[in-house]
Structure formats: structure tokens, C-alpha cells
Amino acid sequence: MIDHLGFRVTDYARSLAFYKAVLAPLGYGLVMEVTPEMTGKDAHHAGFGKGKPDFWIGNGGDATRNGLHVALQAPDRAAVDAFYQAALAAGARDNGAPGLRSHYHPNYYGAFVIDPDGHNIEAVCHAPE
């Protein structure tokens, strides 16, 4: 059910070098970097994995407060939409309405909310429509 997770870091370059070194023995490598130019946000992100990025680090914001991001797999885009509406109805704050995020890949359809404790929770579907 967990698709990927990520957290904020205080020094992106230092953490990038650290995780490249410590994840390599586990067979994990750097799969993707997301730059401010790709997203329009002032943050860098690095996704590590075995072919698919499922372990993410990123800068931007306060790394010591509510820096957790968890993405849950959805079976289809309708489930992503339903997750988003249910989360808002339950008191979550919007952090990205359902939609394509083609800077990750062409079929990446996700929605983001901030839970009551400030964590960034996402539902994502990777299947084509």
C-alpha cells in the first residue's frame, strides 16, 4: 500500500552524498532528481530506489518540523479523487488537488493533503487513464 515516502533534510548536498553512499550496499541508487525548474518551487528532491524511486529526500521548509511525506498507492484515478475529497471532509488541508504530475512521469496522477498533525499525505495512481 505504501508507494513511496520522503522527508526533509537540512543540507541537501550533504544528505544526497550520504544517502548515495549508505543506500548503495542495499542495491538502491539515485533514480531521479527533481529541481526547482521542474516544479516552480524552491526545493530540490532526490528519489532513490531499485528502478523506481520509493525513498525521497528534499530540502525546503523546516526539516525539524512535520517533514514526513507518505504516498499511498491508489488502484485508479477515481480512488485518488475520492481520497482527496474524503481527506478534506475529514479536516485535512489541501496541498495539491488531484491531477497529473508529468515531471515525475507521464501517468503520475496524485493528490496531496496535510493531515491534522501537519504531515504531507498523498494518494497516487501510476496507471494510464
Model-identified regions with their sequence ranges:
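Long, continuous compositionally biased terminal/linker segments
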Residues: 38-82
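Short, contiguous alpha-helical
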Residues: 114-129
